Amino acid sequence: MPQYEITALPDGYEEDSSQRIASVNYVGIEYRNKLAPDAPPIYLDYIYMQQGTVYDQVTDDATISDITVNGMTGYLYLSKDMSKSDNTITWIDTEHNLQFSIDARLSESSILHMAESVALVEATK
């Protein structure tokens, strides 16, 4: 699985490597704020899109809008109450057959900025 990361994290955030989940088809990364340990985490997940893959997003208390991340189509789920749930942005890289998502209790502009900063750091061998 190729390795991606968010390169434009808010101040104080860094990967908590003890929480990384990696398998053949999925990677989940948790970022924690070392300057403010009680701050909510940021999550980056990506998965290979293949037959039988399902992405589940709870939308009960969210406003959904179409969005573009670096030319790729996706959706932005803005929570109506961020004290209860995160904002989420998802997009699909059809060239590499990957679906990405970021979950964070941050503004629309901040989460979009992070999504646009996701970069490949290590290709699959």
Task: Enumerate the language-model features and the residues they cover.
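Short, solvent-exposed recognition patches
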Residues: 1-95
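Surface-exposed amphipathic alpha-helical segments
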Residues: 95-125
